[in-house]
Amino acid sequence: MRKGFGRLTAMLLALVMLVSLFPTLALAAEPVAADSVYRNGNIYTVDEDFSTATALAIKGDRLIYVGGEAGVEAYIGPNTKVTDLGGKTVIPGLIESHMHINGLGESLLIIDAFWKPKDVILEAVKAEAEKAEPGAWIQGRGWMNTVWENTDYPTKEELDAVAPNNPVYLTRADGHMCWVNSKAFELAGITKDTPDPQGGEYLKTEDGELLGCVTDTAMYPISGLIPGFSIEQKREALLLAQEQLFSYGLTSAMNAGTSVEYLNEVYKPLYENGSLKLRSYLLISLSSLESPEAEYLRTTKPEGGFYDNHMDVRSVKLFSDGSLGARSAAMLEDYSDRAGHTGNNRFTDEQMYELVKLAYDNGYQMGSHAIGDAANHQLLDCYEKVMAENPREDPRLRIEHFQILTLDDIQRAIDMGVLPSMQTTHATSDMLMAEDRIGTERIKGAYAWRTIIDKGSIILNGTDAPVELVNPYHSLYAAVTRKSRLGEPPEGWHPDQCMTREEALRSYTSWGAYGEFNEDIKGTLEVGKLADFVVLDRDYMTCPEEDIKDIQALLTVSGGEVVYTRDTSAPAVIWNGLPLTFNSKPITEPGSIYVPLNDTVNGIGAAVVAGKEATVTLNDKSVTLPVKTVDGVDYVAVRALFEGLGRNVTWYAGSNSVSIGWLK
């Protein structure tokens, strides 16, 4: 080995000397004609130096040139497709480092309860029950009691009133609690005397009756009764999720929990027929040493790069606890708002160790869910033990969420090389109840991005969709400001823990690629890497801070192929990071955009008194403005409306969109 290495070194040295003596040899190879060129752009490569460029050239699925305008000319041949970016901003294809791809898709097939008022959810359940056969299950996902006027957990009686003849199963946004009715409890054989399982709880009223909310492992006896989606429905759901991801410029996504059946029956066929183009990093779900997934780990080596670098199967998902919102996150000490309760560990220490050992000893990366400080501590103990017993080069073990830790455990994790996979919008959602749950002292080790980065670690960012909206620009905004997409609180929640804009972008690009062992092929725009990138309607690095949440993807390119193009034929109004929904199209006239009055005031939650003029009131601001009626629909000028309500209005021509800023 040493002798061969010496010969190779001598040959390389000779070649270096030759090139130095005859530098023209280094330039002898002519640049090849690119398949496509994108030029005249504002390109953030997110390389080590965070350098910028103006042009990209692509051959096949790879970048063959990244640089300036003069240099790209050599790559333009007679058949090269050239796109003038017109100065628009380009960033690497975004990497969603923690979500449930199938869960997002399947949530689009059931009742959408995402952060909606309780009465709206109950109306949706009632509507489903009226058209469903008696006994048919009614499902939904996304409710969040912390945003309701009454933040108490909901009851089974509320669902009984609107769906007495159908079992109802509504999953909380975080996926760690369900809200069910009496029919669902009856079918599952669950009564007030049913004992809580390890890692779950049947919540009770003060007099010991079933409340109607169930957490974590206690959900399984009920969810197991619900007829599953067919294979065709699962494939449809996955493609729906892909469509949504591409629309945001997300070209890669980690799926936080995949069964062997789902891998073989859904992912592989869709990749094989060419309809699935999303790059997926799949974590195999592991909950038992006797499961099909455990057997898969014993018999199948971890591998990546399947289907031309579109699928990796080299990591394992474990659940160690539940969620903070459901009070099922495992804590070292009692919850501050529930004496005598410390949450739920899914497994004993020995059970967790055996599961971690199985995955680790078979060469897999770990991507284990841990919210509470006790759950994180348990995982770190197990990681530390298996790493000591069987040292492996560069295992890149991850903890998913890495949400609440003691300061000592944060340092321990970083010293061990454990990668924190965090979701920045979790902080801005949980801020509504986090300090009530764990108090002011423990919050110092929670959602502590600045602390983690300053100690020398990177952070892998994502949304945990469908727990949160999959929009990455909400996450980037939260990372930089510590505010929700509503702009709250105005000064940011614990703003000392903010990331810089560069760090936040790295958390969605180069750092995300490193978390997948894919830093050599994606995450930055460099020659030789995959041509994955997104064109934005504004400059992420320099736009007003409050506009980050409103960024729109104009074009998404994966492996050189355009997989999404934004429709800019009609103007969009972006309110609190989301486009308002209009039943009638806005009207564009020279210098003005008119929006449907009723659709707009309903979308922003304002009151209106309308006639020949309309008076719109939002909070303590009112504006009176003329009404234009077209085909029976009343319209008002968008700028006059929102500036009259004390808001900033910014027009982005590239996306034909208007961003509505915060109150002045």
Identify the residue ranges that each predicted region occupies.
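Bacterial N-terminal signal peptides that target proteins for export
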Residues: 1-12
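Sec-dependent signal peptide cleavage junction
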Residues: 19-31
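Divalent metal-binding segments
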Residues: 30-39, 44, 48-297, 314, ...
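Sec/Tat-exported extracytoplasmic proteins
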Residues: 76, 129-133, 163, 271, ...
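Acidic (Asp/Glu)-rich catalytic clusters
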Residues: 270-274, 300-311, 390-392, 413-415
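His/Asp/Glu-enriched, well-ordered alpha-helical/loop segment
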Residues: 356-367, 371-397, 401-402, 407-411, ...
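Primary recognition of N-terminal secretory signal peptides and signal-anchoring hydrophobic helices
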Residues: 567-664
